[in-house]
Amino acid sequence: MASQNRRNFLKTAAFIGASAASISSVPTKAKTPDKLQESRMGVLVDTTVCIGCRNCEWACKEAHNLETDPLNTYSNRSILDIKRRPDEHALTVVNEYSNPKNQLIPTDVKVQCMHCDDPACASACIVGAFTKHENGAVTWDSDKCIGCRYCMIACPFQVPAFEYSKALEPNIMKCDFCFDRTKEGKLPACVEICPVEAITYGKREDLIAIAHDRIKRHPDKYINHIMGEHEVGGTSWLYLAGQDFTKLDIPVLGEDPAPGVTESIQHGIFAYFIPPIALYALLGGVMWLNKNKNKPEEVF
């Protein structure tokens, strides 16, 4: 009866493979996120006001229990000689650029997660470890993360950082918009400590109105562009500058949300986890055949 079982298995395996192929070949459409609150929060960064004190870096580390030196050491500007990116040790950094309008006063730019309205990191994550909250924040859940790092590839701003120093339980590190602080009615740590109010926290729609008003009143001071108002579908963090944003290492991005590409690829590959299931079924079948190939045929 072994041959009969083998025939049945082959028929079943063929059926599973065909079914899996037909299901996984159905085009998957990028999910539309839940409607965000019109009153969602944001931050306006005015790079013409920032003085590069880096107090925001210190406050961020303090708020997130990251190792840091005393605040008074951050006045050392020598670190600004190199361009840095947020990483596992610093969720926000400040970089310095030359100012074409005044060579004596550089342009300092704070860098962190932009908290996209339609985040590519969330769409690329196959286990739903990222959440876009109604108030605008994009957060990450360590309990769900499997360490695939697709979020790092998907992010148009190259922000998520991986804790390579932790071999067993690494985290994805990025700004969380001080989610726990703002839930309690507090300001984000970086906003609270800024001595010159270069970063302003408030309703995103109000911040956009403020930014447009500044541009209108001071056309010689600002370029006519609010970075983040429309880029990749809009971001919670917004920027004003006195020079082209490309000169400040801010990428040129279209207005279409980035998840349009990442979701169609990732969700197409992993839809229903059918391809992995089909693979496991096939491998199990091969093992069954090898185990039973030398058994004698049963005769009725």
Model segments located where?
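Right-handed parallel beta-helix
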Residues: K101-A120
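Long, compositionally biased charged/polar accessory segments in the mid-to-C-terminal portions
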Residues: V196-F300
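Aromatic- and Gly/Pro-rich amphipathic surface segment
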Residues: N76-N102
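Iron-sulfur cluster-binding cysteine motifs and their immediate structural context
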Residues: S25-P33, N55-N76, L91-V94, D118-K144, ...
